[in-house]
């Protein structure tokens, strides 16, 4: 039996309905920021509240609400949970085999300054992984690397989440941009160009902002040349590639150029003082001794290459998985004539499952009268997590770890991540209930009431969408058309508003419940999600304000920037 979404369930009053829809979100903020609940407790409680409001206020049939939660939970397991397990597993292999000691030494040979390490790994390397894979892999891997180098786990997770602001809109080979073309009818290239005229301002600023968070303004000024090289190289390539190539490659190209530029720059420039966190002076002294003492072990190029091989394999596998024709074959949707890809397509088809969600698939009708498809999307071979697992299998032979130890490390990883994965499953379940019940649309419609000030508040929709769904792609699909319709009604260029949805969304990623859960899982802070949320929330709001100002100015003052 079909059920039609109602966006004003409380007496036809939009504002009252919006207040009801806000309850789960306000509770989640309160649970983490004030009550400091454990992530899985807050996630499950928020899901429960969302289910109650969906059923009692929005009159959503109980079985449909419950099945919507299961749809989200399954997505939380695959691909998101699977990516986290395999990412942490690969990192643990390098630790178990002693290869991470060599990785640490190789990074220290470039710089043992914590500020510069954050720029190289959190900002540049994290952006590369975002462009190649997305879905939590960038924060999980880069944060684990920073912890291995000696960063405080909370700082590592927080810094990587904030650094991930710059690349999110073009993540996973540009999917957030290409996906929104369908519901809006606006060419992806135009949206790519507009986003590429907004985010470079953030990309220049984020490296400086990261270092200020880490060390304060005065310490940040000590390395301003390196910050400039990192941010400007990234921003320039991001602008050029998004405006002249399209949405697929800005992250990958920007990250590679930024990483290479900074590494080369550090060959001939060093900061006057080496920054380390408070409390690590003793270890810092031993690091300096090891770095300058000729008797300390000096690793050869071959040893360094071997140590980095697991992550080089990860990069290669994720990059291959992101190639459109390969990705199509991995999920059984390839229609070309290449022999190998046709064979891969046959395998991928057998390992891709899309069963309809019982009581839900095409059983919910939106305001336009269109039934909404609801399937359990299980792409076993096509998941980036599988690419990382293959890298872990190949790394077994390179690192010479026994199959027994390899299996033991995998079991330990799964055991450690049980509660974080429960957190992820519950918060994604909450996101799906919010969407399928119509609550998220109610909130979007309420923001659209801001009228002429919508030119300022437009990015807030994207921020809200990413907070709810954990994905810039999902936020664009959720609010993209609403952005277009509202923009036309208030005299705003829809290209700007849809781009602002994506640009605003990137600032919400660092406080998204699933992002918080992923980051905590990667650095061993399960149960400490509230601490990380309190760390990132103020930065999220500040960066959102910057995007709102940029969008407002581009409409009223710099309209020539709109393609």
Curated annotation (Swiss-Prot):
Keywords: Cell membrane, Membrane, Transmembrane, Transmembrane helix, Transport. GO terms for cellular component: plasma membrane. It is found in: Cell membrane. Pfam families: Lactate_perm (PF02652). InterPro entries: Lactate_perm. It is a multi-pass membrane protein. The chain crosses the membrane at residues 14-34, 37-57, 73-93, 131-151, 157-177, 194-214, 220-240, 249-269, 304-324, 381-401, 419-439, 448-468, 506-526, 542-562. GO terms for molecular function: lactate transmembrane transporter activity; solute:proton symporter activity. Disruption phenotype: Cells lacking this gene are markedly impaired (but not totally blocked) in growth on L-lactate minimal medium but not impaired in growth on glucose minimal medium. Its main location: membrane. It comes from the Bacteria. The keyword Membrane applies. Is the principal permease for the uptake of L-lactate in B.subtilis. Belongs to the lactate permease family. This is L-lactate permease. It comes from Bacillus subtilis (strain 168).
């Amino acid at each position: 039996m079909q059920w039609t979404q109602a966006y004003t369930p409380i007496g036809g009053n939009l504002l009252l309905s919006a207040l009801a829809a806000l309850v789960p979100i306000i509770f989640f903020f309160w649970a983490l920021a004030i009550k400091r609940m454990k992530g899985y407790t807050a996630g499950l409680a928020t899901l429960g509240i969302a289910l109650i409001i969906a059923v009692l206020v929005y009159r959503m049939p109980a079985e449909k609400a419950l099945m919507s939660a299961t749809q989200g939970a399954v997505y939380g397991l695959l691909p998101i949970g699977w990516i986290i397990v395999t990412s942490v597993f690969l990192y643990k292999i390098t630790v178990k085999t002693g290869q991470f000691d060599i990785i640490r030494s190789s990074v220290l040979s470039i710089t043992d300054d914590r500020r510069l390490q954050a720029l190289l790994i959190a900002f540049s390397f994290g952006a590369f992984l975002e462009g190649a894979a997305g879905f939590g892999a960038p924060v999980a891997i880069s944060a684990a690397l920073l912890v291995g180098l000696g960063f405080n786990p909370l700082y590592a997770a927080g810094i990587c989440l904030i650094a991930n602001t710059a690349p999110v809109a073009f993540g996973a080979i540009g999917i957030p941009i290409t996906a929104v073309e369908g519901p809006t009818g606006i060419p992806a290239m135009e949206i790519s160009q507009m986003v590429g005229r907004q985010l470079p301002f953030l990309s220049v600023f984020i490296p400086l902002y990261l270092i200020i968070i880490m060390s304060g303004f005065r310490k940040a000024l000590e390395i301003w040349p390196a910050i400039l090289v990192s941010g400007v190289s990234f921003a320039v390539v991001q602008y050029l590639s998004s405006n002249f190539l399209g949405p697929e490659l800005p992250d990958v190209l920007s990250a590679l150029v930024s990483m290479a530029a900074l590494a080369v720059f550090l060959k001939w420039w060093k900061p006057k003082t080496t920054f380390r966190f408070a409390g690590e002076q003793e270890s810092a002294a031993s690091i300096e001794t090891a770095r300058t003492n000729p008797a300390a072990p000096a690793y050869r190029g071959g040893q360094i290459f071997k140590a980095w091989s697991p992550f080089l394999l990860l990069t290669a596998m994720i990059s291959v998985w992101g190639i459109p024709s390969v990705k199509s074959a991995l999920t059984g949707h390839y229609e070309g004539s290449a022999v190998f890809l046709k064979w891969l397509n046959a395998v991928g088809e057998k390992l891709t499952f899309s069963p309809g969600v019982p009581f839900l698939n095409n059983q919910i009708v939106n305001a336009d009268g269109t039934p909404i498809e609801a399937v359990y999307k299980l792409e076993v071979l096509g998941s980036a997590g599988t690419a990382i697992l293959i890298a872990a299998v190949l790394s077994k032979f390179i690192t010479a770890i026994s199959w027994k130890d390899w299996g033991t490390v995998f079991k330990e990883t799964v055991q450690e991540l049980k509660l974080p994965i429960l957190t992820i499953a519950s918060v994604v379940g909450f996101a799906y209930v919010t969407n399928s019940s119509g609550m998220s649309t109610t909130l979007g419609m309420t923001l659209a009431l801001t009228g002429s000030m919508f030119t300022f508040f437009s990015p807030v929709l994207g921020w809200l969408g990413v907070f709810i769904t954990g994905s810039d792609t999902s936020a664009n699909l959720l609010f993209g058309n609403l952005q277009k319709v509202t923009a036309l009604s208030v005299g705003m260029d829809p290209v700007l508003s849809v781009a602002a949805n994506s640009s605003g969304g990137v600032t919400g990623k660092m406080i998204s419940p699933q992002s918080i859960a992923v980051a905590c899982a990667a650095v061993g802070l399960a149960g400490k999600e509230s601490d990380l949320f309190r760390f990132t929330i103020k930065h999220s709001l500040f960066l959102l304000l910057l995007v709102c100002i940029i969008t407002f100015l581009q409409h009223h003052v710099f309209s020539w920037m709109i393609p």
